[in-house]
Amino acid sequence: LGKMFIHSPSKFILDSMALFTQSKSFEANSVLGNSRLNQLGLHRFRVQFAAQMAAQRRSKLAKFIHPADVENFQKNGFIFRENFLAAEEFSQLKQELLTTPLETRETLQGDTVTRRMALDGKTLKHMPVTRQFLHSAKWRNLLNYVASFKVQPISYLQVIFSHVRKAKADPQTNLHSDTFHPSAKAWLFLEDVAADEGPFVYVPGSHLLNPARLNWEQQKSEAITAKTDVMTRRGSFRV
């Protein structure tokens, strides 16, 4: 650490301060990526501390959602609802989403194109059904509970096209952990997704910080080198 400070005092100070933030990149942060510190349990501590703080906040938010949803999340790490909306409301929402012209951006990763259309404040002015749904307490309370605090989510209409070219598989299909701290993502599917069309996959119970999970976090943090895959080096551990 002394050598790191002497080499670049300002970077060392900034990297050290990032320990108390959501920063996760092992390659961009000299402190987070320090192998000796991670052998001593730095990454493991950050994982445990973040989970404890999230659990405390969720305990205060649980009253805003159904007890069955709380139970499912605590057991599985996610909340799954079929027919989340009434048939008529869902039909109106789907019709509005599929017929409203939206600015589109897309990314190409491996053999997969992901196309997203932002549902921001400007767009939602012309989409009353979608706006009502995204702002509803029924939807927001679930997001807040899983995230463990009142969030300002970024919402998109998303379409994924798999196997569009001969290339390596989409790296997002590799089982992975997005980051070291609890986070929230949510999907309302407009169509059923077949097994060969890239359905969302989550390992039930993988959010639990049992000894096996903590040992995995520890081992991954210790093993990161310049040859480790880029997503893991950036803090999104691949399984």
Predicted regions and their residues:
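Short, conserved beta-strand element in jelly-roll/cupin
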Residues: T179-A195
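Double-stranded beta-helix
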Residues: D196-V239
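Non-heme Fe(II)-dependent double-stranded beta-helix
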Residues: G2-N76, E82-T173, N215
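Conserved hydrophobic/aromatic beta-strand scaffold that supports enzyme active sites
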Residues: F78-F80, K185-F189, Y202, S236-R238
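Short loop segments at secondary-structure junctions
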Residues: N83-F84, L190-A194, G205-H207
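Residues that flank catalytic or metal-binding motifs in active/ligand-binding sites
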Residues: H126, S155, P182, D196-G198
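Glycine-rich, charged/polar anion/phosphate-binding loops
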Residues: P171-T173, W187-L188, T232-R233
